[in-house]
Amino acid sequence: MRKILVTGGAGFIGSAVVRHIIRNTQDSVVNLDKLTYAGNLESLTDIADNPRYAFEQVDICDRAELDRVFAQHRPDAVMHLAAESHVDRSIGSAGEFIQTNIVGTFNLLEAARAYRQQMPSEKHEAFRFHHISTDEVYGDLSGTDDLFTETAPYAPSSPYSASKASSDHLVRAWLRTYGLPTIVTNCSNNYGPYHFPEKLIPLMILNALDGKPLPVYGDGMQIRDWLFVEDHARALYQVVTEGVVGETYNIGGHNEKANIEVVKTICALLEELAPEKPAGVARYEDLITFVQDRPGHDARYAVDTAKIRRDLGWQPLETFESGLRKTVQWYLDNKTRRQNA
């Protein structure tokens, strides 16, 4: 049985990872999270009292606290998800992204390296540092049907993706220079329960239920590949336990959809699942409002997942249709939680 330190474990993807490990394995989890606006411990209520779960409210930029957590809990692996992740916020406030995503990752790498140096030899060799990143580091696939592979060159477009690209490079450098056994994964857009409502899918669901406009950037034809968060959590655990040191694995759902198609699909699901609409709303689709496009908006992201499917045998269990239906139903069934999401 392993003990895994999960940074950002109160966030959307991190909490799915924590829930997956506690519910489906015998491993223990130390959840390290600063609890920013997007962190939500309610997403972990069901497992919070499990004896294999512990929580530490710590900022990854605080090196002294990181050293304390490593010394106290003595993890066998790190799954690093703590990050500022919203592109729009990065455009207006890039400094927070530089600090958390780059400086914070540096601090965590150094704390992990110092900790590993004093581990017993058998645990020293088995230790893993799994860095969870994004397909946005690869840039844009406009005008092509190609997919990003793990060897695609980096071409980040936003302060967010540039900060994640920087952290990816740090992680690989700590393997090359110091021998820290690192693995990197790059994922496509995630969706599912407990998502903070600044992101596209939860924002559309919650705005529609409140009778508010559904803002769609530009013409809505930007294409994203969508991955159900629980499928991603399974993949991440499989990578940290079975992945090869020094390798990168792309994780995606192979569900390429234009943003406007996603919004219209949500509207259609709500017509079926929530037919009693807010006052003054005849059809949910009538709420769609096209707004000025985001600066530097990438036209298309999509990743090739052949490597993780071939090498680790992972594949998603949810289609976009089944996953989106589960997501919409969750928000309908969890009114109080969705208000606090």
Swiss-Prot record:
Record function comment: Catalyzes the dehydration of dTDP-D-glucose to form dTDP-6-deoxy-D-xylo-4-hexulose via a three-step process involving oxidation, dehydration and reduction.
Report the source organism: Neisseria meningitidis serogroup A / serotype 4A (strain DSM 15465 / Z2491)
Q: How does it assemble?
A: Homodimer.
Q: Which family does it belong to?
A: Belongs to the NAD(P)-dependent epimerase/dehydratase family. dTDP-glucose dehydratase subfamily.
Q: In which pathway does it act?
A: Carbohydrate biosynthesis; dTDP-L-rhamnose biosynthesis; Bacterial outer membrane biogenesis; LPS O-antigen biosynthesis
Biological process terms from the Gene Ontology for this record are: dTDP-rhamnose biosynthetic process; lipopolysaccharide biosynthetic process; O antigen biosynthetic process; polysaccharide biosynthetic process
The record's annotation in SUPFAM superfamilies points to: NAD(P)-binding Rossmann-fold domains
Q: Does the keyword NAD apply?
A: yes
Q: What is this protein called?
A: dTDP-glucose 4,6-dehydratase
A GO molecular function assigned to this protein is:
dTDP-glucose 4,6-dehydratase activity
Which keywords does the record carry? Lipopolysaccharide biosynthesis, Lyase, NAD
Q: Which reaction does it catalyse?
A: dTDP-alpha-D-glucose = dTDP-4-dehydro-6-deoxy-alpha-D-glucose + H2O
Annotated cofactor note: Binds 1 NAD(+) per subunit.
Residues binding NAD(+): 12-13, 33-36, 59-60, 81-85, 100, 160-164, 190
